[in-house]
A protein has these predicted regions:
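Interdomain helical connector at the RecA1-RecA2 junction of SF1/SF2 helicase-like NTPases
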Residues: 2-91
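Short, surface-exposed connector motifs at secondary-structure boundaries
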Residues: 86-93, 113-117, 156-160
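Generic, well-ordered alpha-helical scaffold segments in large soluble proteins
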Residues: 81, 110, 114, 176-180
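Conserved helicase motor "Helicase C" RecA-like lobe of SF1/SF2 P-loop NTPases
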Residues: 99-122
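Conserved RecA-like P-loop NTPase helicase motor core
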Residues: 117-188
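Short acidic, S/G/P-rich loop/turn micro-motifs used as interaction or catalytic elements
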Residues: 29, 33-36, 102-103, 167-169
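Well-ordered alpha-helical segments embedded in enzymatic catalytic cores
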Residues: 70-80, 103, 130-131, 148
Length: 188
């Protein structure tokens, strides 16, 4: 049976049947964020703390801000993990999903400070599709994207993901996770 003819209603079944998807490990990083909101109120929260909906988005935006340490620390941890994976799989790649074009450039700059040269894919780049295709075929380490690598994009060598976006819809998250679950065929 061709893989395209298979349909799985549940991830557990796909894992049990084997050969289609691999398990995903989510590493939750905590951090302490402080900010002054638009009402002039001082806020100080970690990700472990429960807060109201309005502050949840504010906390996430602060965490992903280039001025703070959370984003650079997250990228550093992800880069170290990718290096470890590449000892066994030299073509393993990583994807950072960013907020917007400016954020993607900030993330790329942070990766360069770690000694990496990322491939950046932005929607206004007429070579974006070519860059994604090239990345899927080469052994570059990092792909930095804004909404360009979602449903329909197949890069089997992706092994590390950094969800550095403030888009919190379930559909977008599922599409992002979908970039990492597919098992590689022996010839990929």
């Amino acid at each position: 049976m061709d893989l395209a003819e298979r349909s799985f209603g549940r991830a557990e079944q796909a894992l049990k049947d084997g050969g289609v998807v691999r398990p995903i490990n989510f590493i939750r990083l905590d951090g302490h964020m402080e900010w002054i909101d638009t009402d002039g109120e001082f806020n100080s929260f970690s990700f472990a703390q429960s807060i109201d909906t309005k502050r949840i988005q504010q906390r996430l935006n602060v965490a992903l801000n280039k001025e703070g340490a959370f984003l650079s620390n997250s990228l550093s941890r992800a880069n170290n993990y990718l290096k470890k994976l590449r000892k066994e799989d030299p073509t393993a790649g990583a994807l950072v999903i960013c907020i917007d074009h400016e954020h993607a450039k900030v993330v790329s700059s942070l990766l360069r400070k770690l000694g990496e040269e990322p491939t950046i894919v932005l929607s206004d780049d007429n070579k974006a599709s070519t860059k994604i295709s090239d990345f899927s075929q080469n052994d570059s380490k990092w792909l930095v994207a804004v909404r360009m690598v979602s449903e329909g994009v197949d890069i089997p060598r992706l092994r590390v993901g950094v969800f550095a976006t403030n888009t919190t819809t379930e559909l977008f998250f599922r599409q992002a996770v979908g970039r990492f679950v597919r098992l590689r065929k022996p010839d990929e």
